[in-house]
Amino acid sequence: MTLLVGLGNPTLRYAHTRHNAGFDILDSLVSELNLSFAFSPKHNAYLCVYKDFILLKPQTYMNLSGESVLSAKNFYKTKELLIVHDDLDLPLGVVRFKKGGGNGGHNGLKSIDLLCSNSYYRLRVGISKGIGVIEHVLSKFHKNEEPLKNAVFEHAKNALKFFIESHDFNAMQNRFTLKKPLQIES
């Protein structure tokens, strides 16, 4: 089994903020597959099982995401872990993939690294930098950014669908990496 985790913060206060990119992308995927999440108190997360994937949205707040991830990883004895998360160091419109490496200051990844190691796959969604890191990641996308954000989230969702069918991270990486911001028609 593979654990597929979307990072974000719970509660309406943080809904659709830049830091909740992982939640939003997983929500879109689950909706398109006509599935739904159910809350698991055991893992303090919303879970959805599809094929041999466990889709997880931790409800611990970002800085403690590793607690939910470790709990689900151990319970389901998953072999692979893929984290979908926002990335300040990438411009909006860019999607990159990697295995392992540093956390880039991302507190959700720090928590996962501490409790689970850093040897996992990542789908990184660029959210650009702003003035004041905390304020920026907890802000919603500007109206003029919405079309690009929507297109990029759709692209990331399609990458996950491909991965679920192929189980091939390298093929997903080769097919769906966006090194430059996605170009959309106005």
UniProtKB/Swiss-Prot annotation:
Name any GO cellular component annotation: cytoplasm
Q: Which UniProt keywords apply?
A: Cytoplasm, Hydrolase, RNA-binding, tRNA-binding
EC number(s) for this protein?
Answer: 3.1.1.29
Keyword tRNA-binding belongs to the record: yes
List the catalytic residues. H19
What reaction gets catalysed by this protein?
A: an N-acyl-L-alpha-aminoacyl-tRNA + H2O = an N-acyl-L-amino acid + a tRNA + H(+)
**One Pfam assignment:** Pept_tRNA_hydro
Q: Which GO terms describe its molecular function?
A: peptidyl-tRNA hydrolase activity; tRNA binding
InterPro entries in the record, alphabetically? Answer: Pept_tRNA_hydro, Pept_tRNA_hydro_CS, Pept_tRNA_hydro_sf
* Compartments it resides in: Cytoplasm
Which residues bear the site annotation Stabilizes the basic form of H active site to accept a proton?
Answer: D86
SUPFAM superfamilies reported for this sequence: Peptidyl-tRNA hydrolase-like
> Does the keyword Hydrolase belong to this entry?
yes
The record lists tRNA as bound by Y14, Y61, N63, N107
Q: Which NCBIfam families match?
A: pth
The record's subunit annotation is:
Monomer.
Briefly, what is this protein's role?
Hydrolyzes ribosome-free peptidyl-tRNAs (with 1 or more amino acids incorporated), which drop off the ribosome during protein synthesis, or as a result of ribosome stalling. Catalyzes the release of premature peptidyl moieties from peptidyl-tRNA molecules trapped in stalled 50S ribosomal subunits, and thus maintains levels of free tRNAs and 50S ribosomes.
Tell me its family.
Belongs to the PTH family.
The molecule here is called Peptidyl-tRNA hydrolase
Q: Which gene encodes it?
A: pth
